[in-house]
Amino acid sequence: MATMQCDVVSVKESLYSGAVTMLIAKGAGGELGILPGHAPLVTLLQLGPIRVLLENGTEEIVYVSGGVLEVQPHVVTVLADTAIRADNLDEAAILEARKNAEQLLANQKSDLDSAAALAALAETAAQLETIRKIKNRAQ
């Protein structure tokens, strides 16, 4: 099976570097499936999971809070603002953050409060989507 080099990095660390058969991510125009030999592409990443399919048939899932995806025919690079291995996401903490954001939105005192609450809600929704992907993978 054909492979391509994949690097998933954040400001803080490199989360993955190696050969993959496919990468699936949400770009500015929607979900993208990147295979070896894909046409060159640069796009902004949306909040949510990135799925990296490995040669051995397993899958790595990483949550990203945005960033840039660069695709060359045999190399794909994810430069994420924040990236967390899906296995390291804390569902209880995310649910608590969502609850706090909902309370902030309900008690907003300014447009700034509203914007911060909506951003936090979007981030927690994307993190919970990433956790769901892991749970579906386990079944």
From Swiss-Prot:
Topological category with respect to the lipid bilayer: Peripheral membrane protein
Molecular-function GO terms, alphabetical: ATP binding; proton-transporting ATP synthase activity, rotational mechanism
Pfam families according to UniProt: ATP-synt_DE_N
Record carries keyword Cytoplasm: no
Keywords from the named record: ATP synthesis, Cell inner membrane, Cell membrane, CF(1), Hydrogen ion transport, Ion transport, Membrane, Transport
Disulfide bonds: none
Tagged with keyword Cell inner membrane: yes
Function summary: Produces ATP from ADP in the presence of a proton gradient across the membrane.
Summary of subunit composition and partner proteins: F-type ATPases have 2 components, CF(1) - the catalytic core - and CF(0) - the membrane proton channel. CF(1) has five subunits: alpha(3), beta(3), gamma(1), delta(1), epsilon(1). CF(0) has three main subunits: a, b and c.
HAMAP family linked: ATP_synth_epsil_bac
Protein known as: ATP synthase epsilon chain
Organism: Acinetobacter baumannii (strain SDF)
